[in-house]
C-alpha cells in the first residue's frame, strides 16, 4: 500500500475490534491498541501483503507517573517495500507483564531487555530477560 490513507483503512477494516484508534501524522501511521492484541496486530502488519512491516526498528517506553496506566509502550515498524513507518502503542500499569515479540521479531530481544532494565516492564516468554 503506497498511500497512508489506504493503509489506515486496511488496518481498521481487517483488525477493527483490535484497534482503539489510528491517525496519520508526520507522514507516519499511529495505531493504538490494547496490550492483549499486540501479537495478533503485529503478525498481521508483518505478514499481510498490503502492509509488509517486516522490520522492528525500536521499542521504547514513555513514563507518565501521574497516570494509573503509567507506561506507554511504543513500537516503531518499517515497511521497506512501501517506505512507510508505523508507530504502534498501548498503555499498561506498573508491574503488568506483557507479551514478548521475540518469536516474531528476534531483534526485539535486546530492545525488550533494555525496556526491562530501564523501566522494570516484564515480557512474558522472553528467552533471556536479564539486566
Predicted regions span which residues?
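Terminal low-complexity/charged segments
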Residues: 1-131
